[in-house]
Amino acid sequence: VVWRTRAEGLPGIRFGLKADALDQSISPANILIRRPVNDLPEDSKEPSISSGPEGTRQFEAAISGLKPDTLYYYSVSQNGEALSPPGETGTFRTLPVPGTARDGLFWVVGDSGTGNRMQAEVHTAMRDWLKKEKRTLDGYLHVGDMAYGSGLDSEFQGYFFESYAETLRETVCWPAMGNHEGRHSSGATATGPYYDAYVCPSTAQSGGVASGTEAYYSFDFGKAHFICLNSHDLPRDPGGAMAQWLKADLEKTKADWLVAFWHHPPYTKGSHDSDKEQQLIEMRSMIMPILESGGVDLVLTGHSHIYERSMLMDGAYATPTVSENVILNDGDGNPAGGGAYRKSPGLFPNEGNVQIVTGHGGTTLSREDRPSPVMRSTILEFGSVLLDFKGNTLTSQMLNSEGQIRDTFQIVKEGRVTVQRIAKPWQPPLVAGPRTMPLRSKGSGN
């Protein structure tokens, strides 16, 4: 649990299984305190954050000995006084034991950190959907660019922590660094405001193989394994440290589901073109072969300000991207339409994956006239993605800022599947309508 204040004082945290019975605590001596480096003497060895308002104190409390898959309530304090209003407590749910049969719901958003009305509407639409469906989130994935325009500490505070305060008080966020955060943060040294903002598992605290860095990591949720990569400022070549760790992590996992996420999309024709930009080309040609040999089911990215979703595909490493003989199922994947995509139970090499570009979380949207040839759905609307794991079925839904489900597909793992490549798959038509969507919505004046 991480929090900040602007004054000196004795930090405290209490937690428990009931909101009105926070009967456990951590000694203040065991709470890590970080101060902005500019507030410290030049030769200080004291823990620090790279930047922040003068007088900032960042507190990090690592809580151990908790029960798995259990909801806890917590409250933080200073000098014995609660920092939240009376009656308000935060919550967190611990991860289930890896391999446990456990349903899970995850929210995915990208390119959202603007602090504008569209970001707020996307967030509100998700929370309204949860209330309507009587669901709670098990996790929150952000695929980068959560702090426009330069990933400054002040932008993290205003455009991420304040904008998503309700959700962050009760849900763990698993982040990937975007190019805007990369302007003031470094993946090589794992320093800067991005790395101050999050505490990511570098020593396999949440499953997987220890990466030794917060720049890339993995975690388990029941029978699903999630991998976060740095596509911005670390080497992407197969012999590099990140790719070598990825191979080791894939070899170890015994999960039934494999989800990977990072910022720069291997396939897009939105505000960016994956056939023309180095980071996108290299993630496609160098990283995707490793993931597909490990049986990846779903890849989540952002950067391109649009919603795009592919057909079931495998082996599309060439530049430019073509669809011939890399599409395994060219249907829509919708159980109410052409039917779900099918894969064998467990993780098998090269049985296909779906790519989602979810860069439509709150900044100006745009697209090219012709969609990527591997995409089944291309939508120029603000929104986010909901991932629902239930047994042998993964359901993905794109929820727009007005609360409408605009795209749905499923992957069902049942029976042994024989891979068949389609020589001439369905091709997306030219997209009619506007090529850009500005930062406003119906009825707004900005």
Q: What role is predicted for each listed range?
A:
Residues 102-176, 181:
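Conserved, compact domain cores that house catalytic/ligand-binding motifs in diverse enzymes
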Residues 9, 19, 181, 235, ...:
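Feature marks short, surface-exposed loop/turn motifs that line or immediately flank catalytic pockets
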Residues 150, 268-269:
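Short, solvent-exposed loop/turn segments at secondary-structure junctions
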Residues 109-113, 144-147, 179-180, 231-232, ...:
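Active-site metal-binding loops of divalent metal-dependent hydrolases
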Residues 1-120, 124-137, 348, 380, ...:
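Acidic, histidine-bearing metal-coordination/catalytic regions of metal-dependent phosphoesterases
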Residues 140-146, 178, 249-250, 261-264, ...:
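Conserved beta-strand->loop/alpha-helix structural units within folded catalytic cores of enzymes
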